[in-house]
Amino acid sequence: MRIAVVCNSAFTGVINRFGQPYPQPPQPWPQGRIADSVVAALQECGHETLLCEGDKGLLTTLERFMPPDPLARTSGMVFNLAEGIQGEYRFTHVPAMLEMAGVPYTGSSPLGHGLTDDKVISKTLMRDSGVPTPNFSIMRRGTESTDDLRFPVVVKPRHEDNSFGLQLVHEPAQLQQAVKMIVTKYAQDALVEEYIDGREIHVALLGNQEVEVLPMVEFELGEHEAPLLTWEAKYLAAVQPPKTCPAKIESKLATLLRDISVATFRACQCRDYARVDLRLDRSGQPFVLEINSMPGLSTHSAYVLAAMTAGHSYSSLINGILDVAHRRYFGNGILG
């Protein structure tokens, strides 16, 4: 089958530079290497692949690679890794283009990506579904009332991913500066939520009508300087927080975490695969921090570690995601 792997490794394919750009993370940025790994995995299963940019030329590129079939049969699919170039709700841009063009693709719809992109909406949906999530407030000045919040608090952009801008604030006097940094650097509101001191657990999910919960991953933060998984802690620190998979969690709590994670997946309208990030407080009470509708697929990521612990190879995971998406569209899988 023809599979186009779409990512954003260059940020030049636009008509104008307009709107908030995707934050440029500290280098090296792994996106291009991940796309190459996905291409190789798809080729292992015999797929004809094309690696292309999720920019203004995408539909022209796809039409050449997978031209319309005269009998209206599917001419190919997209494995979507595109996180967007600029503007609002960037994760929705490529899926929206593909919806309009009639090209099937892996991962969440524009709706699903939009709901998870907006942390306020996703946390509200969680609460409405009975999923516990830390108390929070939205701020633009840092002088708003904090009467409903317990310090320390975590301050982060309302819409960004990859732990961009994540800050831990211990005292109300520090809050204004932290909020100002978010508003100035990222041109959006700051989400201020209560910090949950305890274990950090990531839960990888695969599927749709039936969702497979992969073995849980725990980040061992006890000996690590940073109490938060910031971008720097995850990707640039000399010693990164070690991960344990499967996490050592007693049976009753593990069942609760699985149920909470699937409920979050469904509340936020995710598809095919996602990752739910939780904290367990010192009493063992779980809180969902957020859900990632396009979790990282690098060979060192928590999602891939969970899949490999479940018995997948990297290739079988990538082709399994494609198979799940194909089954969602057409009622049958590719893998048989």
Curated annotation (Swiss-Prot):
One of its GO terms (biological process) is cell wall organization. InterPro entries: ATP-grasp (IPR011761), ATP_grasp_subdomain_1 (IPR013815), Dala_Dala_lig_C (IPR011095), PreATP-grasp_dom_sf (IPR016185). Keywords: Cell wall biogenesis/degradation, Ligase, Plasmid. It holds the Pfam family Dala_Dala_lig_C. PANTHER family: D-ALANINE--D-ALANINE LIGASE, D-ALANINE--D-ALANINE LIGASE B. Belongs to the D-alanine--D-alanine ligase family. Could be involved in the biosynthesis of a cell wall component. This is Uncharacterized protein y4sG.
